[in-house]
Structure formats: structure tokens, C-alpha cells
């Protein structure tokens, strides 16, 4: 990604001037080893749709190794990086977010979590030593998946679901439609003189069941609270941040809310984030779980397959309410 002139910057969404948002100190923190972790998770998902996870069991070495490999790729020349794209949907992409006109000050690698798919993509990403990149990615994803299973099983317990694996089995399914994304937000000093904030990734919710984010020490992530206030999330490169996705909102019949979030680019420092998106198989039916609903409680959402929802999501803009077409009305 190159230095931008003022006219070039105009194609990106520049937020209006506002006082810098202080880092929000009220982010829920869940210790995965805490005796009451199941209830802490449920409370955080209900009140915020988001929480910070500590004592997660993923070795810091795996995080550092992947960060180093990602930065090694993003520091390549643009022509070299372009050989790993365009995204189909997997591969390298820059500035364009999806097919419907959304843009951001970001470049990324999007990968399937299936090792058989990672392998051929690795040849395009690092031609000189693809096997090392593949091993680093697979080691990280395996560790994060296992951690994610534990979170979902505690979540099921906290919701009073009798079978602990009700949620985790969807991600353990060999046909699980999960993916992994490396986002790089280069510094953009040209924006500083404009008294604007450059959006790296515009406001949106994640469509999957759950997403697991880890970033370097550069801030930029913001979440929207239930009252509509945007707050900045303090970075912590040793911890993970867990997002409730649209599918989980439906499965809990609205008890959990998929959190709206965005990323603002920094003027002087680059931000690198790595996100695991845990999704079900394409054929999986998504609907409110009877085991979480009270007697006589009405379903807020129509049943749909993950494939149907995914197709609908790809026809929408980033900030759209993608669940709206699947919400039940009084006439249903």
C-alpha cells in the first residue's frame, strides 16, 4: 500500500472530527480458568457481545511466530503481494472489502482453516518457503480452535444447555465453514493534517457463530455499546478478544447480541490483527435453540441454513443489518 494524496484519500471513508475516544476500561475480562467462567462468559455476551479472554492456554510463541510471518509477507513489494491475490474469496486483498463497494485502509490475507486449502495458497504467499508459513498458520489455528471449543462449551453450560457440545460441535464438524484472516492496517500520516480519522475497516457485525481476535499493541479497534456509544478497546497482544456473531445471536434468540465494531487506522503505527471466524457447515440449520428458550417464548428469527445466510450477507453492504430479512414479524 502506497502513500496517498488528498484526492486519493477522498475515496476512503473519513470520519468527521471528534475528540479522541479514550480507551474504554469497562471491557469484560474472562479468565478461562476461573471457576465461574461459564457465567462470566454468558454475562459478557449478553451485556456486550464481546469480551477479553485471559489465561486462554494458547502459547504466546504461536502468536509471535504468526505475527512475524504475517509482517514478513505484508512488507513485500506490492507486485509480490498481488501474486497471492485476487481473493477468490481466499488470498490477498487490498482496500476493497467485499464485492459491494466497501473500502478501507487495510490489506489482508484470507485463508480457509482446512489444511488442504491452506497448503496451495501458501505457495502463492511464500514461494521461497511455503511449508514454514503453512506450519505456523496451522499451529496457531489448531490452538485457537481448541480454545474456542472450550469457550463454547462453557457458554453452553452457562446457558443451561444440557449437552455441552451443542455449539462446539458445529465448529468441530469437518465441513465447518470457518475461515482465518490476517489484517494489516499500515500507518497513514497524511490523515493527521486533515483532522480526520481514516477507517481501516468499517462498522459491521461478524456473520459467523463466534470470532476470535488477537492483535499487536497498536490500538484502533472500537466496539459499539448497547446505547450506541463507540468506545476504543485497549490493545493487549497477549490476550484474545471474543465477538458474538450473527448466527449465535439467532441461536440464543437474541439473548446475545452480535457486536458492531470497526477499526480506525493509526497515523504513525501499523496494526496487525489475526481473526479466526468459527462458522457451521453450509448445510447447517440456524434457528433459536429450544434448550435456551423459556416456556411460551416466541422465536424472534426464521430458520435458515448457513449457506442461505452467507449468500444474503455477500449481497449486502458492510454496515447493513444482515439479520433483518430473517427476523420474524407479527404476521409470521
Swiss-Prot record:
Its cofactor is Fe cation. Keywords: Dioxygenase, Iron, Metal-binding, Oxidoreductase. GO terms for biological process: gibberellin biosynthetic process. One of its GO terms (molecular function) is metal ion binding. SUPFAM superfamilies: Clavaminate synthase-like. Residues 175-280 form the Fe2OG dioxygenase domain. It comes from the Eukaryota. It catalyses: gibberellin A1 + 2-oxoglutarate + O2 = gibberellin A8 + succinate + CO2. The active site is at residue 271. Fe cation binds at residues 204, 206, 261. Disulfide bonds: none annotated. Its EC number is 1.14.11.13. Pfam families: 2OG-FeII_Oxy, DIOX_N. Pathway: Plant hormone biosynthesis; gibberellin biosynthesis. Catalyzes the 2-beta-hydroxylation of several biologically active gibberellins, leading to the homeostatic regulation of their endogenous level. Catabolism of gibberellins (GAs) plays a central role in plant development. Converts GA9/GA20 to GA51/GA29 and GA4/GA1 to GA34/GA8. Belongs to the iron/ascorbate-dependent oxidoreductase family. GA2OX subfamily. This is Gibberellin 2-beta-dioxygenase. The gene is GA2OX1.
Amino acid at each position: 500500500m502506497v502513500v496517498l494524496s488528498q484526492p486519493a484519500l477522498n475515496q476512503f471513508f473519513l470520519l468527521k472530527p471528534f475528540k479522541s475516544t479514550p480507551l474504554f476500561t469497562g471491557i469484560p475480562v474472562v479468565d478461562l480458568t476461573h471457576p465461574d467462567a461459564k457465567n462470566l462468559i454468558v454475562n459478557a455476551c449478553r451485556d456486550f457481545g464481546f469480551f477479553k479472554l485471559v489465561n486462554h492456554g494458547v502459547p504466546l510463541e504461536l502468536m509471535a511466530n504468526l505475527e512475524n510471518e504475517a509482517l514478513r509477507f505484508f512488507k513485500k513489494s506490492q507486485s509480490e503481494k498481488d501474486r497471492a491475490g485476487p481473493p477468490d474469496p481466499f488470498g490477498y486483498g487490498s482496500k476493497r472489502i467485499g464485492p459491494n463497494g466497501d473500502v478501507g485502509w487495510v490489506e489482508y490475507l484470507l485463508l480457509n482453516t482446512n489444511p488442504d486449502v491452506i497448503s496451495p495458497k501458501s505457495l502463492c504467499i511464500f514461494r521461497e518457503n511455503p511449508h514454514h508459513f503453512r506450519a505456523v498458520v496451522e499451529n496457531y489455528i489448531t490452538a485457537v480452535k481448541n480454545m474456542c471449543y472450550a469457550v463454547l462449551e462453557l457458554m453452553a453450560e452457562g446457558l443451561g444447555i444440557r449437552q455441552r457440545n451443542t455449539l462446539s460441535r458445529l465448529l468441530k464438524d469437518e465441513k465447518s465453514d470457518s475461515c482465518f484472516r490476517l489484517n494489516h492496517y499500515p500507518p497513514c500520516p497524511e490523515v493527521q493534517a486533515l483532522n480526520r480519522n481514516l477507517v481501516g475497516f468499517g462498522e459491521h457485525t461478524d456473520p459467523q457463530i463466534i470470532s476470535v481476535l488477537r492483535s499487536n499493541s497498536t490500538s484502533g479497534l472500537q466496539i459499539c455499546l448497547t446505547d450506541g456509544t463507540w468506545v476504543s478497546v485497549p490493545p493487549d497482544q497477549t490476550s484474545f478478544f471474543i465477538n458474538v456473531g450473527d448466527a449465535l445471536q439467532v441461536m440464543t434468540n437474541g439473548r446475545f447480541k452480535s457486536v458492531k465494531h470497526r477499526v480506525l487506522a493509526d497515523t504513525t503505527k501499523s496494526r496487525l490483527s489475526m481473526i479466526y471466524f468459527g462458522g457451521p457447515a453450509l448445510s447447517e440449520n440456524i434457528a433459536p435453540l429450544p434448550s435456551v428458550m423459556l416456556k411460551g417464548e416466541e422465536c424472534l428469527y426464521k430458520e435458515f441454513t448457513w449457506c442461505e445466510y452467507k449468500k444474503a450477507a455477500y449481497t449486502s453492504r458492510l454496515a447493513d443489518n444482515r439479520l433483518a430479512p430473517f427476523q420474524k414479524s407479527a404476521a409470521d
